[in-house]
Amino acid sequence: MKKNVWICAFATICAGALLAGCGKEKPAPQVSQLPEPTEVGQLIETETQEPATETHEGEARSPFTGEWIDETVATKRPVAVMTENTKVTLPQYGLGQADVIYECPVEGGITRLMAIYQDYSGMERVGNVRSCRLYYVYFAKEFDAIYFHAGESKYALDVLNSSFIDNVDGITGKGGQYFYRDNSRKAPHNLYTTSDLIASGIEKYGFSTMLSDSYGSHYQFATEEEPNLLTDGVDATKISMYYVDPKPWFEYNSEDGLYYRFEFGAPQKDGLTDQQIAVTNIIIQNCYSTLKDSGNGTLDIDYQSGGTGKFITKGKAIDITWSRESSSSKTKYYDTNGNEIVLNPGTTWVEIVENSKADKNTIN
């Protein structure tokens, strides 16, 4: 009987121990997922992510900058605005939005600018606007531009009054209402226009706003992915132009690939943004020149006979030649192998230089 009691007690203790052990669960063991074995030489297919493809829906390449822009803008005719370039008129307004800027010498050692805008919207002030010279008419014409100016030299009057170029004159005729004077400045350095006035003038005169389907691209352009590095060119990090009054120069910034413009000893800025003017391409176009009057007469630039020059981009420069078939055609620029030059997308500054002064420009 005693033996049976001990057996029962022992069984009770064991049962208690087992129940106590069941009160605390053991953690589930971690199971590693091993890949299925493969035969030697068998490839394992893995899912790769394709790089995102940039789309340009609703956009087109600008015929004047080579950049992607709104497709409705890419088919518009540009406007060309004559802009004064003397110290008293600084800062100029709107130059930072231009697609192409021409700088030409005029009388007395000064230069005058012509800014070409395909997208001329959003500018509350443009200029100041000054008078036309005959050769500027032909530079504007090759862009099929609507030309805004404030008067003209006597030699330009006949062509401006003809049907050769659509133009709006802020001094004579009915065009004055599309310009305004800033009374805080003295005339003639105080005439300006705006985007709205430009658009109103074009509408009032009934000028077409669309480029012809046959116009094409004004220049040949590389792409952003494959820029033209001018690997055979010489270094061109500072370009100094021999214009007596403004004494302008450009300095290259290798970080953004732009040439920053200086004149009158300081950065040249756009009064709309207070940002320094910077461009991607510089073309120096050397031309024959004459004086139409004796003494300090009216300068005339030969825009058609062809000549030499320089093409500058991405910190390099090469020699070029240029030609133009007619008064209405585009100027073409060629490298020393006879190939048309390829610009990089962005703004272009064209320097018109008299042949007699071409060797006084410096490129370093």
Give the positions of each predicted feature.
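Sequence-pattern detector for short linear motifs
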Residues: V5-W6, P27-P29
